[in-house]
Amino acid sequence: MVNRRWQLHVWELTGPPDGWEQQLKQHLAAEPVFAVISGLGGNNWEPVHRFCEAESVPCLFPNVEVPAGRDEDFYSVYFSRGVLLEAQLIAHQLQDAGEGIRRVVQVYRAGDVGEHAAEALKAASPGRQIENRVLKLHGSSKDLSALLQDLGAADALVLWLRPEDLKALPSEPARTSQVWISGEMGGLEFAPLPAAWRVAARIAYPVDLPGQRVVRVDYTLSWFRIRHIPVVAQQVQADTYLACGLVAETLNHIVDAFVRDYLIERIEMALDHRVLTGYYPHLTLAPGQRFASKGGYIVRFADPAGARLTPVGEWITP
């Protein structure tokens, strides 16, 4: 085996998303990389996904809130469907609720990923009366109260909102039969809900419970502490560490067979047996499966204050 020194290139994309694919092609021509590892994409990864599929470049476990891929794709793999998985979890709960809910009202801010999640929930709930209410992109969080005034006991409320908007909810919760919030958008167990809302709300939670993932995540945090790397976005950093570790281990196993398709196949084979899976209880990939974590919980706050959670039922694989 020939010893090789791997070099990391950082590609930064600028300007509007419709120009990203051309920038990526220019980067690839100048630096013909073997794979794209992790990455930070926020709410729009579609141009990067298209590029990786078109150029046959493995695109491995990016940090994105709305994955662009489909299970039928090959070169792009993700840890989770993100808020789209949360929409499926809530749809599962709505199905269990039967006819007791007359109307589902979804609230999201224009231009944010909650819009995609709201579309996914509507698509997963055929026959339901679903009404979307939209906060203006740069509007005041105080406008939330007006959007919730007419809700009643036969309604359910879904909040696809960031922490800043959750903080601005009125002190008394809406008089609905059910309230769900997005865990990924709201901050998971640190979602800053007003006290009365904490009692009423259920959280779509697309990762393992804090007490069950603590050992796996602490292993990663210890690695950061030893190297004096500040932790400023714990899940993003843990997922990035996991992605880099998976790729490093896989490269050791493929010896000199540096073929991009083979890298994907080896990751599929190795992932199912991995013990340290970070935020996720179990990860698995296979042909026709491009999202490694396939389920989540519905949880509620256990106390009037603090971050302790109680699951409302078992792990759900929608």
Feature names for model-found ranges:
Residues 1-318:
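Extracytosolic ligand-binding ectodomains
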